């Protein structure tokens, strides 16, 4: 059981945070699309509350993951992996974090500028309504979601390509 990343494998905490993020995002993304088509009413309020709670949870997990990445550098990629692929992998990871943070922060700001009260880190926060800004943050929220979906597809495709065509054990590092 690794408590810190090794040269070849991620630590158990890193793996747990990764897979927890994956599970929540794979619930959260379809939930968000479902929410868009719901009429206003009790069901929408319930689903929206779940969506906000999961969104804030992802936000906290990503912050913890970023701190973990700073304190606990990632394992090195095998030198046999082409330098360009290593660069693309790094960029994909960075952009995944940027997209997730963009989604969560824009979602938070959209709710706040709509005049809603959010509880963040055990504090209730409310700001003055600004529906124009709320609409802009909603657009960022949507664009960031589509960006995230594209990045996830690239991420999974790269894992499959590495497993099937390159025969390396890249996936083992995070399992």
Question: Which residues does each predicted region cover?
Answer:
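Membrane-embedded alpha-helical bundles that constitute the cytochrome b-like, heme-associated redox core
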Residues: 1-175
């Amino acid at each position: 059981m690794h408590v810190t990343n090794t040269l070849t494998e991620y630590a158990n905490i890193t793996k747990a945070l990764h897979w927890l993020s994956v599970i929540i995002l794979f619930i959260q993304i379809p939930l968000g699309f479902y929410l868009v088509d719901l009429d206003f009413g009790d069901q929408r309020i319930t689903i929206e509350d779940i969506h906000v709670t999961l969104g804030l949870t992802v936000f906290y997990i990503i912050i913890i993951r970023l701190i973990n990445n700073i304190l606990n550098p990632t394992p090195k990629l095998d030198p046999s992996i082409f330098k360009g692929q290593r660069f693309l992998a790094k960029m994909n990871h960075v952009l995944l974090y940027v997209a997730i943070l963009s989604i969560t922060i824009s979602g938070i700001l959209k709710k706040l500028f709509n005049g809603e009260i959010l509880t963040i880190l055990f504090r209730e926060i409310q700001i003055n309504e600004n529906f124009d800004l709320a609409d802009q943050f909603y657009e960022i929220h949507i664009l960031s979601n589509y960006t995230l979906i594209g990045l996830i597809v690239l991420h999974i495709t790269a894992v499959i390509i590495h497993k099937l065509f390159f025969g390396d054990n890249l996936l083992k590092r995070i399992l």
